[in-house]
Amino acid sequence: YDDVAIGINICEDIWIEDGPADLQVKAGASLIVNINASPFDINKTNSRRKQVMEKAKKLNVPIIYLNMVGGQDELVFDGGSFVVDSSGEIIFQASQFQEEVFSFDLDVQVKDIVSDSKLTLNIKKDKIPELQSHKTFDELESMYEALKLGVADYVQKNNFHKVLVGLSGGIDSALTATIAVDALGSD
C-alpha cells in the first residue's frame, strides 16, 4: 500500500530470535502484522506486550499484534490486540474479551524492498474514524472476563436456547450463578 512492504507472520514467529519478522524487515518490510490465536493465561498479557514492544524497538518497525477473541472448546482467547510503534511504545490497545473492529492511521518509514518478487495490493483509503484505546484488566478481572466469555461462547456456539444451573447454596454456587447471569443474562 503506497509502496509499504508488510511482513505477515503467525503467532510464535514473532518470538523467534532472527526469525520470520527479522527476515521480513531485512527484506524491506516497513510494518509487521502478527496474527495469533493465543489462549488466555493470567500471566500472558504483560509478557506478550513486553516481547512485542522489544521486538518493534529492535527492528525499528511498527508491529500490529492481532489476537483471536472468544471461547473454543476448552480454550478462551482473550483478544487484547494492540499496535506498537517503531520506538516500542504501545499506541493502541483493543478491548479484551470482546470482539471489536478497529482501524487507524499509522506512520511507517518506507524501505527499499530486497526481494525479486512481491505481491501488490491496492487498498481504497477512506476517512478513518478516531480510535479510543481500551484498558487492560488486572488479574482478577481477567479471570472473571475469561469465565464469562467462555460460558457465553460455549452456549452460543452449541446453539443452546436454555441452560440449567445446579446450585448447592455455597459460595461456589453464588459465583457460578453470577458468572451465568453476567455471561448469558438473567432470563
Question: Language-model features: where?
Answer:
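Beta-strand-turn-beta hairpins that frame and shape the catalytic cleft
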Residues: Y1-I8
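Internal active-site segments that recognize and position negatively charged phosphoryl groups
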Residues: I8, I14-W15
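Conserved hydrophobic/aromatic beta-strand scaffold that supports enzyme active sites
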Residues: I8, V83, V101-D105
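ATP-dependent adenylation/nucleotidyltransferase module used to activate substrates
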Residues: D13, F137-D187
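Generic secondary-structure signature for well-ordered alpha-helical cores
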Residues: K57, V61, S86-E89, Q93, ...
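CN hydrolase (nitrilase-like) catalytic-core segments centered on the catalytic cysteine
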Residues: W15-E99
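Generic beta-strand/beta-sheet core signal
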Residues: N9, N34-I35, I64-L66, V84, ...
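Catalytic P-loop NTP-binding/switch module of NTPases
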Residues: E99-A146
